[in-house]
Amino acid sequence: MRSAFAAVKPMVGVLALATAMLSPGSPSRAQQATTVDISVKGHHFEPAEIRAPANRAVIIRVKNLDAAAMEFESVSLRIEKVVAAGTQGVVNVRPLAPGRYEFFDDFHQETRGTLVVQ
């Protein structure tokens, strides 16, 4: 006769594997994110329009080439990220529905761009 633990032991392994696959730091989640690079120079985003697939997380790497700090901000994305002069910042965006999402430099309001999600 098998012990009750022997019957449960295989299930523990399955649950551990499922937990590892769904954890935030797992390779499967990281592979689902799309990385987009954007730079700021002369108080302009380059490119001013960036694209990403729908329903996938987006990592936006913002490289500030200006001599002043900038704040990457988006009301629709609910994001604010200060990027010091001459440095790079990373903005993590949740999976989004298709649409256009405006962003701007809060320190220089004329600096504007759009994330197009398709």
Q: What is each PLM-predicted segment?
A:
Residues 48-50, 78-82:
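Beta-strand-rich interaction surfaces with strong enrichment in secreted/lumenal proteins
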Residues 62-64:
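Asparagine-centered strand-capping/turn motif at beta-strand->loop junctions
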Residues 18-27:
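C-terminal segment of classical bacterial N-terminal signal peptides
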Residues 29-37, 83-118:
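Extracellular/periplasmic metallocenter environments
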